[in-house]
Regions:
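Glycine-rich, proline-tolerant flexible connector loops at the mouths of alpha/beta enzymes
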Residues: 31-50, 92-95, 143-149
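Catalytic cores of alpha/beta
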Residues: 18-21, 72-82, 123-135, 180-198
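Histidine/lysine/aspartate-rich catalytic loop segments that bind and position anionic ligands
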Residues: 118-156
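Hydrophobic faces of well-ordered beta-strands that scaffold small-molecule active sites
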Residues: 2-7, 31-33, 64-68, 88-90, ...
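Glycine/small-residue-rich loop that forms an oxyanion/phosphate-binding "nest" at active or ligand-binding sites
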Residues: 45-104, 117
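Conserved, mostly hydrophobic/aromatic
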Residues: 16, 23, 34, 80, ...
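Glycine-rich phosphate-binding active-site loops on the catalytic face of alpha/beta enzymes
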Residues: 88-96, 139-150, 193-213
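Alpha-helix-loop-beta-strand connector modules within alpha/beta enzyme cores
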Residues: 46-66, 107-116, 156-176, 180, ...
């Protein structure tokens, strides 16, 4: 089953509340919260995303899909655990070594939250294979992290396929989330490669009818 995690990075100012309500009615599966610190990536959305996540938690029962694009992962986890997310995803590249990756996975799990691990386009997917049995989701960035509205990097489709083959071969129970440049033209290739959760923001938010786009992305 394909699920949709709608990124709210490009939500229009002044229309946040009505947009969040409309997305829930349109049957998005998750709200995707893009948390950036201005260091790991250039853009800084940290405070506004914490504010949005807190607000969504008050008005909606839909799960929060927190994507940390930050250098100080531990502090961000502490801040965003307060909004009781369904899953917190952090970047492999934000950790100084593999031991820190293990420690962060443990910390998130100890706080009764699901764990996701993300990789940038230039990171070889094989580098995170050893962590797959201990996480709930692997997020494959299909664009360079840091801003919305980018074009999907087509070679990331092969990366997803490689990951999916490894997961199936080793009978590992882990979701694959694809994030970046996902729209009606690119979604099919990503789904066929093995992604079962699609992050889409711009393609949904510019549509007149969110449900039409979300339903089509799920097919």
């Amino acid at each position: 089953m394909i699920e949709i995690s709608t990124s709210i990075l490009s939500v229009k100012k002044g229309k946040e509340s009505q947009t969040f309500i409309a997305l829930e009615k349109a049957k998005t599966d998750y709200f995707h919260i893009d948390v950036m610190d201005g260091k790991f990536v250039e853009k800084n959305t940290y405070n506004i995303m914490l504010e949005y996540a807190s607000y969504i938690k008050r008005i909606s029962n839909l799960p929060l899909d927190i994507h940390l694009m930050v250098e100080d992962v531990n502090s961000a986890i502490d801040d965003f655990l307060a909004v009781e997310p369904n899953i917190i995803t952090f970047h492999y590249e934000a950790c100084k070594d593999k031991e820190e990756v293990k420690q962060i996975i443990k910390k998130i799990k100890e706080n009764h939250c699901r764990v996701g691990l993300s990789v940038k386009p230039e990171t070889k997917i094989e580098e995170i294979y050893e962590f797959l049995p201990y996480i709930h989701m692997c997020l494959v960035m299909t664009v360079e992290p840091g801003k919305g509205g980018q074009t999907l990097l087509t070679d990331m489709v092969d990366k997803i396929s490689t990951l999916k083959n490894y997961i199936d071969k080793n009978n590992i129970d882990v979701d694959i989330e694809a994030d970046g440049g996902i729209n009606l033209k690119t979604a099919q290739a990503v789904k066929e490669a093995g992604a079962n959760i699609l992050v889409s923001g711009t393609a949904i938010l510019i549509a007149k009818d969110y449900k039409v786009i979300i339903d089509e992305l799920k097919r």
